[in-house]
Amino acid sequence: MIKEPFLKRFVLSTKKLVTKIPRYFSKFSNKIYDNHQKLSILILRQRLKMTYREIINFLKFNPLARAMLNLKKVPEFTTLIKFHNRLKPEELNSLLCDKQANIIAVDASGFQTNHMSYHYANQWHSQDKRKYRRYLKLTIAIDTNTQYVMAQKIRLSPRHDTIDFPFVLRDLKCDYVVADRGYDSKKNRRFVLRQMKSFPEIPYRSISPTYRFSGGNKLEFHKQIYHQRSKVETVFSVIKRKYGNYILSQTFESQKKELIFRLIAYNVDRKLILSLVLIRVSSEPFNISFKYLNF
């Protein structure tokens, strides 16, 4: 369970973030709960890995959380479900981080759409000739410096990695884009060079020719920059370990929004961790050693 001091910082950061969304979607709203309160609860739900009923019970027995969310009374779990269904993924995307970085890393990973493990699901569908492969495929672009998630694209079932490469990068700005061999294609490199005005650091497959500019010069590959790509795998590992590798929602639209809420919760969490590191570093005394100085 999240500790009380960290809960305070998490809720405060969440309340500041959700102000990007209008407080009410309509002037005819009943004004009992505003959008900022409901968004904060849904983000907190992902941080605590709770169901709708569980997060409501948590708020009922946690006066600190209610006070920080300015809740005069706790909403019903159906209120959160209806609000979640009304939200659009585009509105949630605006809650992700800034769109500019030095190095951006792109990768994809799968999330289960039920509680069954991969092995158990295959046993359950053992009569089928093909393996059980129904899952959500999440493609993300991260800032390798802060490890914030900057953009995302979610699809149902297996898809090739290169399909979503331009989509997650189209609104971003950077100096370098790093990705693994799964994104090796002339089309992707041309997109990064011409559309983003950046340099692609994508290793070539054995069957791929070297990309050449119009003048005949080869596109250089910098291994030192490419090694930053491992950080996107770290981000996926943290998300699945802290928030779960399965999705509770039933419909595809709800599953997408639940996963975006999970990314938002991760970004808030990451921001708090980085701020604590900076505070700890700045609070250390600045000692100067005169051992090797001669006067």
Regions found by a protein language model. Give the residues of each.
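Basic, short loop/linker segments at the boundary and entry of helix-turn-helix/winged-helix-like folds
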Residues: 2-47
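Arg/Lys-rich, glycine/proline-spaced intrinsically disordered segments
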Residues: 28-29, 205-215, 272, 282-283, ...
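Polybasic low-complexity intrinsically disordered regions
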Residues: 30-31, 36, 44-53, 57, ...
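Non-catalytic DNA-binding core/recognition domains of DNA-processing enzymes
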Residues: 37, 59-61, 76
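DNA-recognition alpha helix
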Residues: 53-69
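Major-groove recognition helix of helix-turn-helix-like DNA-binding domains
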Residues: 67-87
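Helix-centered, glycine/charged polyanion-binding patches within enzymatic domains
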Residues: 181-248
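Basic, amphipathic alpha-helical segments enriched in Lys/Arg and hydrophobic/aromatic residues
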Residues: 222-295
